[in-house]
């Protein structure tokens, strides 16, 4: 059985990501000064008595990260603070973000922008994959509260707007899961705590403005966009959605200006014969692809 991952709250040190670094973009670490690292002399080559193995003992200069803004967590050269509200939005709803650990190391993530727009006592980010009542008493208490909702689409989910009209208790807290769709599914179904709150979903035809990251379908929204729509409904204030989307629009604009490409949804690519990868042989995955091609909600 896979060992359980320890959950953390936002701000705690994260373990270094495994694997090689991705190609540099305006949001990634700058290259080490001084050009490319020295290459080892091939075995048997003349003119250098130092063996290739000896290079392992040489000191390594680590690339320095560019200075980041303390508020929006972006590099200072592309700081998004001018697009954030001057003061945090005054809301009564408490937002809990359950973030998959892999999202914490992503450069183009939306949760830091969302947190920068809200009061610290109204936005709590918990990082992890497995949560239990024994290990997180606070989260368990929140999940058992009758005023707590969890935003996750599915057959058992009620449309948020319809729920607040019929519910005798007005929601005070809403939980969102931050990660890829497969990561979010894993967190939702493998944590019994998240079955306790009332499950709701958004009924919207709005297309995502987070165009620099591929989504499964044209109707999938980023975590920030989901929070913007949900909070505007719960707070009965459409200006909240506009305010929260402003830094996301600026983020995408900056990236496109620096060479990023618009990422079309997997659904669009499949339906138009543009999907670059071969179709999977696994029957379950193949069935998902067919549903996407036919615009069937999965």
Curated annotation (Swiss-Prot):
Keyword list, A-Z: Acetylation, Cytoplasm, Nucleus, Phosphoprotein, S-adenosyl-L-methionine, Transferase, tRNA processing
Subcellular location as annotated: Nucleus; Cytoplasm
Molecular-function GO term, any one: tRNA-uridine aminocarboxypropyltransferase activity
Region (Disordered): 1-55
Location of Phosphoserine modifications: 132
Motif (DXTW) on chain: 178-181
Extent of Basic and acidic residues compositional bias: 1-10
Gene Ontology CC annotations of this record: cytoplasm; nucleus
Enzyme class: transferase
Record GO biological process: RNA glycosylation; tRNA modification
Biased composition (Low complexity): 34-45
Residue numbers of N-acetylmethionine PTMs: 1
Enzyme Commission number: 2.5.1.25
Catalytic activity line of the entry: a uridine in tRNA + S-adenosyl-L-methionine = a 3-[(3S)-3-amino-3-carboxypropyl]uridine in tRNA + S-methyl-5'-thioadenosine + H(+)
Function: Catalyzes the formation of 3-(3-amino-3-carboxypropyl)uridine (acp3U) at position 20a in the D-loop of several cytoplasmic tRNAs (acp3U(20a)). Also has a weak activity to form acp3U at position 20 in the D-loop of tRNAs (acp3U(20)). Involved in glycoRNA biosynthesis by mediating formation of acp3U, which acts as an attachment site for N-glycans on tRNAs. GlycoRNAs consist of RNAs modified with secretory N-glycans that are presented on the cell surface.
Family assignment from sequence similarity: Belongs to the TDD superfamily. DTWD2 family.
Protein name per UniProt: tRNA-uridine aminocarboxypropyltransferase 2
Source species of the chain: Mus musculus
Upper classification of the organism: Eukaryota, Metazoa, Chordata, Craniata, Vertebrata
